[in-house]
Amino acid sequence: MINLFRGLLVVLCFASAMVSAEEKNILVTSGSDRAAPIAVVPFGWQGGSVLPEDMAEIISNDLRNSGYYAPIPKQNMISLPTQASEVIFRDWKALGAQYVMVGNITPAGGRLQIQYALFNVATEQQVLTGNVSGTNDQLRDMAHYIADQSFEKLTGIKGAFSTRMLYVTAERFSENNTRYTLQRSDYDGARAVTLLQSREPILSPRFAPDGKRIAYVSFEQKRPRIFVQHIDTGRREQITNFEGLNGAPAWSPDGSKLAFVLSKDGNPEIYVINLASRQLSRVTNDSSIDTEPFFGKDGSTLYFTSDRGGKPQIYKTNINGGGAERVTFVGNYNANPKLSADEKTLVMIHRQDGFTNFKVAVQDLARGSVKILTDSNLDESPTVAPNGTMVIYATRQQGRGVLMLVSINGRVRLPLPTAQGEVREPSWSPYLN
């Protein structure tokens, strides 16, 4: 489903004049170079029963999803070592592997003890070794942890594979009977649990910076209202109750404020509320549509979408006052801004001049260059991993709303497993303890 604001903004764009003076000649690129081959050998298992999870497969998928590594398929492996002393480096050199990981799982007093080691094939040196223990139910957590440790050791970038994701499903049973469900899962779509069910739409779920609360829009009162919910207890608090549109909540970096969109005074404008004092401040004041706020790291800069220049583009402003500065200049539509962790890259929904397709793209904020990451037609709601290496977004495949993951370097693009029905509105968690 195309975002409500997108539809409204597009209508306004076709009725508006072209933007002229601010256009810049900026390169648009796509594609990327080769990922590093890595072999994650199936872990040895010293127990009797079959384990419920394949550790090596989860680790391989995590490293693949980052876009940095290309796992070597198990069927291509010449040998299957499970500990460091069994690694024959010539086997992995023959396969072109740059790195090889081995591991072993041992039952110990009702728990599982996992030992693992990672090697540089060219130098034949061990670069990482470790131990982790847990229960059968924690196998997936331990696999994500090992992937996080390995990724950080090899790249210097903190791994984001132990994070979570929010999304909304919509299952239509009849014309007037649709069930909306707010789900939380692993970042890769596994282990989904239901946080909220409603017969009315749920929109724009967002994790708080502490990962313990979420904000979202609910139509349960037959009109849009913003709620904050505590994940562990399910306790909810209604934040807004204004006439008209109440939408697009975004957390400040310290979790003390929410930015959102209200139309109580006419057209949609961006406001910020202090959650402790409930003091409401208006940020934008323009005759155009201003929507989709996103906080910068400093807690005072807001990126947002506006058609004030004639077509939807991304701007930034200060919540304490001042004018808005245009950020995007390539294409006739740029919306739904998100920032990478280092704030060097802007992730957005982009439409090129002369085209009708909406795609996920990234803009280098220093150079202004734009790279398109996806090849689908109706992308929306991009959300960025806390380390900035991956993006999850909603799109359509075979007439159904689905979630996709794309690496920020464009090397990997794949669908995420989710429940039946229409799936939309993904939101990536921060790092979790």
Curated annotation (Swiss-Prot):
Keywords: Cell cycle, Cell division, Periplasm, Signal. Gene3D superfamilies: TolB, C-terminal domain, TolB, N-terminal domain. The keyword Cell cycle applies. The keyword RNA-binding does not apply. Its main location: periplasm. Residues 1-21 form the signal peptide. It comes from the Bacteria. GO terms for cellular component: periplasmic space. InterPro entries: 6-blade_b-propeller_TolB-like (IPR011042), PD40 (IPR011659), Tol-Pal_TolB (IPR014167), TolB_N (IPR007195). It is found in: Periplasm. GO terms for biological process: cell division; protein import. HAMAP family: TolB. Part of the Tol-Pal system, which plays a role in outer membrane invagination during cell division and is important for maintaining outer membrane integrity. The Tol-Pal system is composed of five core proteins: the inner membrane proteins TolA, TolQ and TolR, the periplasmic protein TolB and the outer membrane protein Pal. They form a network linking the inner and outer membranes and the peptidoglycan layer. NCBIfam families: propeller_TolB. Belongs to the TolB family. This is Tol-Pal system protein TolB. It comes from Pseudomonas syringae pv. syringae (strain B728a).
